[in-house]
């Protein structure tokens, strides 16, 4: 019994950290693909990022009461022994859904040739976990098998039906001419399985703004969907490249996840930042978070966001 207690204490210390940093300014949080989870019950914000640690640790959390300063909250996920996908752990998006917290995250196994895909974790004990895998080992991913996918995000429609939006990567085996794609997939209520077939929504080249200096349209990153309460518009933000990493938006013409989606011709943000998400803060203000610059070290960026006539207005960093 004594050995078990010692082992448990060691695990807790490795997760929280005896030297946890506190009062870290947002401008000092190094993080790609930042996703802010709002805990309205306790008046807190959480950020979970990819960070490799001891004993299979892969995801690390911060918490804040004001979006200006953050405290380290420790590791919130450790891979089970023998887990098939130890690589990447990109874009951990964390949602409160049906009374529990779920994390959609992109993983792979490069050595064994397992292509990237999105898997789903769940915490039964609040936003700081511990998170556990809920997709069985024989499937690993919630994204389609045999496709190189990433950046799965959750959207729950007006009927309470969960959907996942995700990217099919430009360098995978399922795309044409190295042009990335965005798809959607209806999920079951438990978020551990799918309903029906996935639907391809668009290719990078369908968006007039997503043109690199060479003229090519390649990358589709981070599709994130937001319903505008006033207009009813279903708006998708996603990231690609102009001359630098940028963000654009598209509107569903039916108000449904399956679209069709029409792209705004003007870029939303073109100052070398992206992989965005939208949230309302504890006061109800509309905010956007993303990483900027796109090169290391990428920094957590949070700023105000405005909507006019059912579309997001261009973003400017102060």
Named regions from a protein language model:
Residues 1-22:
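Bacterial Sec-dependent N-terminal signal peptides
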Residues 20-318:
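Carbohydrate-active catalytic/glycan-binding domains of CAZyme proteins
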